[in-house]
């Protein structure tokens, strides 16, 4: 596996960055704090998500940004892969908004699925990745400082031996689980055996036979007493029926006697009502005669000859029609009077209003003339302002007469000068840092030389191979001083160009501002000229309209006089119509009284006729009631003859005897039923006991069979647990031997020193370093640089072991070293270079080293330079340089 391309947007200190990574050794170079390690963090995060971050997810998003995106392209086993992650931050919190893995054959979405697929693809999770391929900054001594048990867990996990231990533990857990279940089953067998013995001792079969015999005897007694009870109930019901019919006859006789009394009372009441009706008929006939006399007098006053109600009503309707015609005429004339009066008043008001409007228009015309004069004055002021601005613009443009660029190009000129100045400033800072580093090495070397020691390895000067390095460093300091002076001179020249560009940009801004002011002055001049013309036109229109309104007012006054004359004529006509209407109303009221009296007389005669007919009907009803009395008296005699006293007494005696027997037999039956229920319950209990005994015997056989099965499973799981433990121990011993060999090869290759003979790795992953004289040393007793190289050797040995695999080659990610020189002096850095080159020779496809040390650059195939902008505090990445 190897990384091919990394793209970032708003990730940590990077706004936008993209870098391509080729096979071989790539050194990411830059000053401390420039953002080198953040590129590795991005690769690690792209593969394993938040597990790869030392901080929160929100800290991964650039300050001030809302989203961050990371795209990592890599090759693996001949296929191309692409991981895309997008983070969304809001209010101090962040979450993964998108996580996609594109494989050669599929597309996988979602954080969990993507990370699981990558872990399976590389055969390692995030922790294994750090322990194997990724030596993070400050963790170069992680493996060597770890306890042997921790180191064993790390390496076992990388070599997949942890899976065997996991399987062994699972088998052990399964064995314990089977033992628990088997113990429970054995206890269950004991309990079942005790229950079966208890059930057999109770002898449920004999108890069942005894209870069945007693139940048959009780059932026979119940059937005998129930038959006797039914016979007593029949006797009681027959006697009750006789007594009930007797009571019904007595009730019927009482009803007949009551009905006879009611009919007699009804006959007497009808006779009294007939006498009352005769008096009322006489009263109605007298009232009809009086009303006829009053109607004759009214007819004479009205000039009518013996009219009836129909004739009087027709005359009343004719007079009502005449009155309505006059009223209709009044309704027509009265509104006309009001309308003409209102029209006359309205015309007079219109004339006054028109006079007022004409006067207002003349006043408005005078005001518009004054506004037109004011606008003309403002127009003249704007014209003078335009002439002054033209002179100012010409003066400002004079700044470009001897300028290096034409008007309009000043801002581009300033941007180019500013960019060149920033690049030179960054170059000055880099040169000063390189010069300081070289000067420090010279000072340190000179101090060691003064003490008679080699500046590279600290050994005595005699026979030291690197003494000439001090002269090279002094020459390097002189070269850097000369180059720094040249660059500072260039920086001063560019600074003058920046100042000139800033003055030209200010001149362009001044011209733009003056031209905008001139445009506004032209607009104001034209606007005020238009206003003056418009105001004068409006004043002329208002004077013309005032003259028209004066003529309209005169016409309105003439119309008001004509309307008042017409209204006076209509008032005279209305007075004559009101007099006719009053006379017709008086005749109409008299006719209404005549009609009322004639109709009342007719109603009285009709009422007398109806009452006479009702009196005759009452007489007919009394005849019918007398016939009904005869029938009721015959029915009473029949009921009296049906009464038999002896039969009634016999029925009462039979009923009493039957009720006494029923009262005595019911408690006896209740007691027998309780005995029967008790026996049935005992029979059910005996049958249940027999069924439970059979069920317990069957359950005992089933549990016994399960116990045998569990014993077989227990034996199999125990054997499996033992097999996994033995296999893990055997494989670990093979790996320890192979890892020890690879570790010694690597350490001997990179640390060519006569002080140490070999390194020993025990089966528990304890490390021991043996000197040439055979004296053992703990790794912690080595110097800082030696410990760092020792640990790097161990890490690369583990990497080689994984690369070779237990059963052949295994695909591995790039070997990544983040600031591995942090614990190394200049001499050990050279040995680190040897280590990197040796891994290259051993066939590691891609090695990525992050460092600020210049010496590592010489060992690289490609160099990616990282720098940070001091103004924006953002890092940027240069295009890889092929060495």
Swiss-Prot record:
Q: Where is the composition biased (Basic and acidic residues)?
A: 313-326
Q: Which PROSITE patterns match?
A: ZN_HOOK
Q: Which InterPro entries match?
A: DSB_repair_ATPase, P-loop_NTPase, Rad50/SbcC_AAA, Rad50_ATPase_archaeal, Zn_hook_RAD50
- Claim: Nucleotide-binding is one of the keywords in the record: yes
How it assembles, according to the record, is: Homodimer. Forms a heterotetramer composed of two Mre11 subunits and two Rad50 subunits.
Record flagged with keyword Plastid: no
Please provide the record's keywords in A-Z order.
ATP-binding, Coiled coil, DNA damage, DNA repair, Hydrolase, Metal-binding, Nucleotide-binding, Zinc
Leader sequence residues: none
Q: Where is this region: Disordered?
A: 271-290, 305-326, 508-565
Q: What happens when the gene is disrupted?
A: Mutants show a slight growth defect, but do not show increased sensitivity to ionizing radiation or alkylating agents. Show decreased rates of survival after UV-C irradiation.
Domain Zinc-hook residues, every copy = 407-506
One GO cellular component assignment for this chain's record is: DNA repair complex
The positions annotated for binding ATP are 12, 32-38, 137
Q: What does this protein do?
A: Part of the Rad50/Mre11 complex, which is involved in the early steps of DNA double-strand break (DSB) repair. Rad50 controls the balance between DNA end bridging and DNA resection via ATP-dependent structural rearrangements of the Rad50/Mre11 complex.
GN (gene name): rad50
Note accompanying the cofactor annotation: Binds 1 zinc ion per homodimer.
**Name of the protein described by the UniProt record:** DNA double-strand break repair Rad50 ATPase
Q: Which GO terms describe its molecular function?
A: ATP binding; ATP hydrolysis activity; DNA exonuclease activity; zinc ion binding
> Which cofactor is recorded for it?
Zn(2+)
């Amino acid at each position: 596996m190897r990384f091919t391309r990394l793209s970032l947007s708003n990730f940590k200190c990077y706004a936008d960055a993209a870098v391509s990574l080729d096979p071989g050794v790539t050194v990411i170079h830059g000053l401390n704090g420039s953002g080198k390690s953040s590129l590795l963090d991005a690769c690690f995060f792209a593969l394993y998500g938040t597990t790869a971050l030392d901080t929160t997810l929100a800290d991964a998003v650039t300050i001030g940004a809302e989203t961050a995106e990371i795209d990592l392209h890599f090759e693996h086993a001949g296929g191309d892969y692409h991981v895309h992650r997008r983070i969304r931050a809001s209010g101090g919190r962040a979450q993964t908004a998108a996580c996609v893995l594109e494989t050669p054959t599929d597309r996988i979405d979602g954080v969990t699925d993507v990370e699981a697929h990558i872990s399976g693809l590389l055969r390692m999770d995030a922790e294994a990745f750090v322990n194997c391929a990724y030596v993070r900054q400050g963790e170069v001594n992680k493996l060597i400082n770890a306890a042997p048990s921790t180191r064993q867990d790390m390496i076992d996990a990388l070599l997949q031996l942890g899976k065997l231990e996991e399987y062994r533990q699972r088998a052990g857990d399964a064995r314990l689980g089977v033992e628990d279940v088997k113990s429970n089953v054995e206890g269950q067998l004991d309990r079942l055996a005790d229950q079966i013995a208890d059930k057999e001792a109770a002898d449920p079969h004999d108890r069942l036979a005894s209870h069945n015999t007693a139940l048959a005897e009780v059932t026979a007694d119940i059937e005998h007493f129930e038959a006797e009870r039914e016979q007593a109930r029949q006797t009681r019901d027959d006697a009750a029926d006789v007594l009930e019919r007797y009571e019904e006859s007595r009730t019927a006789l009482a009803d007949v006697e009551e009905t006879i009394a009611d009919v007699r009372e009804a006959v007497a009441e009808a006779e009294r009502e007939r006498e009352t009706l005769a008096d009322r008929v006489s009263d109605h006939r007298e009232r009809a005669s009086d009303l006829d006399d009053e109607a004759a007098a009214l007819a004479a006053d009205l000039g009518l000859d013996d009219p009836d109600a129909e004739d009087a009503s027709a005359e009343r309707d004719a007079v009502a029609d005449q009155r309505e015609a006059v009223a209709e005429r009044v309704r027509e004339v009265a509104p006309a009077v009001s309308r003409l009066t209102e029209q006359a008043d309205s015309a007079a008001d219109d004339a006054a209003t028109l006079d007022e409007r004409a006067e207002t228009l003349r006043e408005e015309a005078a005001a518009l003339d004054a506004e037109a004069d004011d606008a003309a004055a403002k127009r003249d002021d704007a014209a003078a302002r335009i002439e002054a601005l033209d002179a100012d613009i010409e003066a400002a443009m004079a700044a470009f007469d001897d300028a290096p660029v034409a008007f309009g190009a000043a801002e581009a000129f300033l941007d180019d000068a500013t960019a060149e100045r920033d690049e030179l400033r960054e170059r000055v800072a880099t040169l000063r840092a390189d010069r300081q580093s070289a000067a420090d090495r010279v000072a340190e070397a000179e101090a060691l030389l003064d003490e008679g020691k080699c500046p590279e390895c600290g050994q005595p000067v005699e026979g030291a191979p690197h003494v000439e390095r001090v002269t090279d460093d002094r020459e390097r300091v002189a070269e850097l001083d000369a180059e720094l002076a040249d660059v500072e001179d260039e920086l001063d020249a560019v600074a003058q160009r920046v100042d000139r560009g800033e003055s030209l940009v200010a001149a362009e801004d001044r011209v733009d501002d003056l031209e905008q002011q001139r445009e506004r002055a032209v607009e104001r001049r034209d606007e005020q000229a238009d206003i003056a013309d418009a105001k004068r036109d409006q004043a002329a229109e208002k004077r013309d309209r005032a003259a028209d309104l004066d003529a309209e007012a005169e016409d309105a006054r003439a119309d008001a006089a004509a309307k008042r004359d017409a209204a006076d004529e209509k008032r005279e006509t209305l007075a004559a119509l009101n007099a006719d209407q009053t006379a017709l109303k008086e005749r109409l009221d008299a006719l209404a009284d005549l009609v009322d009296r004639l109709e009342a007389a007719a109603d009285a005669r009709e009422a007398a006729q109806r009452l006479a007919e009702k009196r005759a009907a009452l007489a007919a009803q009394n005849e019918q009631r007398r016939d009904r009395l005869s029938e009721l008296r015959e029915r009473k005699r029949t009921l009296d003859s049906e009464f038999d006293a002896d039969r009634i007494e016999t029925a009462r005696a039979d009923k009493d005897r039957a009720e006494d027997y029923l009262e005595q037999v019911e408690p006896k039956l209740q007691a027998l039923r309780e005995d029967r229920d008790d026996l049935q319950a005992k029979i059910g209990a005996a049958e249940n006991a027999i069924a439970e005994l059979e069920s317990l015997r069957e359950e005992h056989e089933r549990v016994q069979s399960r116990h045998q099965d569990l014993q077989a499973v227990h034996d199999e799981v125990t054997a499996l647990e033992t097999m996994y433990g033995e296999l893990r121990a055997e494989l670990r011993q093979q790996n320890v031997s192979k890892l020890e060999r690879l570790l010694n090869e690597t350490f001997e290759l990179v640390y060519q020193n006569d002080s140490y003979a070999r390194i020993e790795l025990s089966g528990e992953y304890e490390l021991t370093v043996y000197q040439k004289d055979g004296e053992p040393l703990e790794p912690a007793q080595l110097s800082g640089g030696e410990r760092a190289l020792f640990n790097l050797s161990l890490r690369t040995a583990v990497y080689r072991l994984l690369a070779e695999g237990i059963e052949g080659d295994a695909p591995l990610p790039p070997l990544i070293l983040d600031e591995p020189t942090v614990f190394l002096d200049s001499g050990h850095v050279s040995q680190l270079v040897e280590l990197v080159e040796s891994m290259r020779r051993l066939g590691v496809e891609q090695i990525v080293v992050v460092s600020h040390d210049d010496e590592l650059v010489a060992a690289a195939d490609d160099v990616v330079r990282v720098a940070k902008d001091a103004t924006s505090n953002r890092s940027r990445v240069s295009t890889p340089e092929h060495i």
